[in-house]
Amino acid sequence: MLRGWGGPSVGVCVRTALGVLCLCLTGAVEVQVSEDPVVALVDTDATLRCSFSPEPGFSLAQLNLIWQLTDTKQLVHSFTEGRDQGSAYSNRTALFPDLLVQGNASLRLQRVRVTDEGSYTCFVSIQDFDSAAVSLQVAAPYSKPSMTLEPNKDLRPGNMVTITCSSYQGYPEAEVFWKDGQGVPLTGNVTTSQMANERGLFDVHSVLRVVLGANGTYSCLVRNPVLQQDAHGSVTITGQPLTFPPEALWVTVGLSVCLVVLLVALAFVCWRKIKQSCEEENAGAEDQDGDGEGSKTALRPLKPSENKEDDGQEIA
């Protein structure tokens, strides 16, 4: 709604103008406004159309015109007794003075804000009095959604993926829809939040959690219900099977070959060691056999005949 009206002088002006209107009889003057709401984009100008049918000989000195908010009765703009009383709304409103004499009582509202949204009443008094209200709807288109993934790498089928759709600076609150690659609506595991900034415009963040398949496309649609304008965003996710890149494959093959060669070399060395050890053991055993035979010969006892001969020789 409109805010920030003027001080006591504005109130006096309103009461005076309304007093003039109330003294008039209701009847002949017919005020016409648009039945459909006037839609205005933020930061643009809007025209609230209001008209009446002046009778022959009509002069602006006979005209009393007031624009005010329907709900709060706060003054927006007035024209009384041939003088434009100006805007009580931050100097952002204006009439069409050259067209007043033709019955055009429309109001021009400049640099529309979110707080301007609401119903405005057009009061016209010449000799008789009539009024009508027109609605102003404020809108702002949403930006193209940005899509983010978490996690965003090393994705495998079966992983739980969080997809966030973000759109900014829109009004009024958006409607958010998710669909898969086949156009099937996704309503489960969706969380949407909308927060207004200092200007009253909304930032939208919608989160979808899905289990990743072999591949999939997910789209987010942010709709402005007043403008019937859709902003689209999509992301395609491919769950890659666990495979090796060519570089890693060659490294793996090279390491495997080196390992095989190392094992063969190690086996050959072990075989040589075992063979050498066996040969040394065999050689030692043969040496021990030769020494045993020599010892047996040296320790062989003398025969009796040999003892007798020795004895006889000693006697002789």
Curated annotation (Swiss-Prot):
This is CD276 antigen. Residues 1-28 form the signal peptide. Induction: Up-regulated in cells mediating rejection of mouse transplant. Modulates T-cell-mediated immune responses and the development of acute and chronic transplant rejection. Plays a positive regulatory role in bone formation and has a dual role in the bone-immune interface. Induces antitumor immunity as it activates both acquired and innate immunity leading to natural killer cell and CD8 T-cell dependent killing of tumor cells. It holds the Pfam family V-set. Ubiquitous. Keywords: Disulfide bond, Glycoprotein, Immunoglobulin domain, Membrane, Signal, Transmembrane, Transmembrane helix. Gene3D superfamilies: Immunoglobulins (2.60.40.10). Its main location: membrane. Residues 270-316 are cytoplasmic. It is found in: Membrane. The chain crosses the membrane at residues 249-269. Glycans are attached at residues 104, 189, 215. GO terms for molecular function: identical protein binding; signaling receptor binding. PANTHER family: BUTYROPHILIN (PTHR24100), CD276 ANTIGEN (PTHR24100:SF155).
